[in-house]
Amino acid sequence: YMLPGGEIQPKPFVSDVRERVANQPSDIFGSGMSLVVEGEVMQPRPGHMGSVELQTNFHPLWSEGMQLYWKEFKSGDKLSLVFDSEVEGTYYAKIQFTVAPDYGTFALRVNDKVITPEVSLTNGEVSLLLVNLGRVNLEKGKNELQIESIALAPGHDTGFFGIDKLTLRK
């Protein structure tokens, strides 16, 4: 602290400054602009195999207490989920999935671009898995997340899949 009338010693030295000074967290971490799309608000396109429903009150860690649940499909079947974005651009994407003993392996695309050729959602117990998808391009308006069943869980004739949420960060 300084008494009224005091002087700062030494004087500010700015002639050799090469980088902008971080004055707030967003100067280091970016604007923090993110878009969270809950699985349960994504709209399935017509023509998919199996059934799609909202599953609630099953897993306590699901965001908003529910997930989008796709069931009774075969290997090779596809599900397209539509979601809206108010902005366009490149975002870093993460998806939180449910994993379980009867879930299989899937390929994921956003707007027809492969973002992960294979992700296994088979696990010994029901839990959540956060998958980093890297960079994805969003369009203003309608966007599409495409899920393709690559392999069913061992010993199962039909498949199961659950998505909790998609998080996109600038």
Q: What are these model-derived regions, one by one?
A:
Residues Y1-K170:
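Extracytoplasmic
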